[in-house]
């Protein structure tokens, strides 16, 4: 690999916003927020909406996402279209 052209690849803690589950992995993402991991070290914290802990494919359970508000907002903005 050429030096100086690749982003920094470092340990990062990802947190599932809906379950609170945290994962320590490596990524090029950075964040101003930090978290202290089980090993006592401080790592950047990235909060994500969906992980394998909350996605219906991996959990096998249906989870209601907050799409009702988005649909209503879309209908208010563009109106409800009637089919012929």
From Swiss-Prot:
GO terms for cellular component: ribonucleoprotein complex; ribosome. GO terms for biological process: translation. Pfam families: Ribosomal_L31. Keywords: Ribonucleoprotein, Ribosomal protein. One of its GO terms (molecular function) is structural constituent of ribosome. Belongs to the bacterial ribosomal protein bL31 family. Type B subfamily. Part of the 50S ribosomal subunit. HAMAP family: Ribosomal_bL31_2. NCBIfam families: L31, PRK01678.1. This is Large ribosomal subunit protein bL31B. It comes from Rhodococcus opacus (strain B4). The gene is rpmE2.
């Amino acid at each position: 690999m050429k030096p100086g052209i690749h982003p920094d690849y470092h340990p990062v803690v990802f947190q599932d916003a809906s379950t609170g589950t945290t994962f320590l992995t490596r990524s090029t993402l950075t964040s101003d927020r930090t978290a202290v991991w089980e090993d006592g070290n401080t790592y950047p914290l990235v909060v994500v909406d969906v992980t394998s802990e909350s996605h219906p494919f991996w959990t096998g359970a249906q989870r209601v996402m907050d799409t009702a508000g988005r649909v209503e907002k879309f209908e208010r903005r563009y109106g409800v279209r009637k089919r012929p």
